[in-house]
């Protein structure tokens, strides 16, 4: 089964994302910030990470930078899901190692398309 880790400080976004992902056949886990997300990845590397930008403790950019610097071959696809919608943020995310970028709010179809673009859904 495909696995996805949702890293977002919003309980509502995690709930909505979980519902969409489960209908697409993903087993879903959650983290409230980048630090929890990194810990979850080290315990069990997911296939995909849905990642928020602005979170307490550790931001999405800090998360992806540390994740991509870790040794080893297992690296998940990372889709930023954020309200940061300017070109500078998109470039920064892609440069840091993001595979896709989707603006909040998003719907089922948009998320499904983004997941297809990174090889899932």
Where are these regions (language model features)?
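Active-site beta3 strand of CheY-like receiver
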Residues: 44-50
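Receiver (REC) domain active-site loop signature in two-component systems and cognate sites
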Residues: 55
């Amino acid at each position: 089964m495909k696995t996805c880790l949702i890293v977002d400080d919003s309980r509502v976004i995690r709930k909505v994302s979980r519902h969409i992902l489960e209908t697409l056949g993903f087993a879903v886990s959650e983290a409230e910030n980048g630090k929890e997300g990194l810990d979850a990845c080290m315990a069990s590397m997911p296939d995909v990470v849905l990642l928020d930008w602005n979170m307490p403790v550790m931001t999405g950019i800090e998360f992806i930078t540390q994740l991509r610097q870790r040794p080893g071959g297992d690296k998940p696809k990372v889709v930023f899901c954020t309200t940061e919608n300017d070109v500078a943020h998109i470039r920064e995310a892609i440069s840091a190692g993001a595979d896709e970028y989707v603006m909040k709010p998003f719907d089922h179809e948009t998320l499904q398309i983004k997941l297809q673009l990174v090889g899932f859904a």
